[in-house]
Amino acid sequence: PPRLMAPPIHEAKHRVWLVTPYFVPGEAARMALTSAALGGLDVRLLVPRVSDSRLVTYAARSYFDELLEAGVRIYEYGPRMLHTKALLADDDVCIVGSANFDSRSFRLNFELSMLFRDQAVAAEMAGLIGTDLQQAQEVQFARHRPLWRSRLPEAFARLLSPLL
């Protein structure tokens, strides 16, 4: 999956939208997303507000400040657990499958993802993601988060993120 997902992110000219229930990116994935955002692309990340793994939720949130500073717009979906795994690049590239955006899916698990280079499929995926974004809350940059309640658990989870 990283070989499948990296080129569309690097080649995108207008937008990169990523939807994943488990967001625990490695350095290359973080660099791809932040570079795209710093390059002026519309980069959006949609994750569940609460995952079925609290440790994964903390690990994901530990990366938010870095991504927000680069210009990535992050949304937390709340009505229910989000299980969608999709990447949309520009108006013609869409990847869907079983792979989460985490090291475990990229390196350990047997995952299947399919890349579509088709404007109709990409338009349909953009509509589906757009509907989910309307039901999500955009994350705001918050430097003054409580140490014990959020920053410390996030830092601990980030240390474990290569294992998640």
Predicted feature locations:
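PLD/PLD-like phosphodiesterase catalytic module centered on the HKD motif
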Residues: 12-18, 22-164
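Active-site cores of enzymes that catalyze phosphoryl transfer or operate on phosphate-rich substrates
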Residues: 1-4
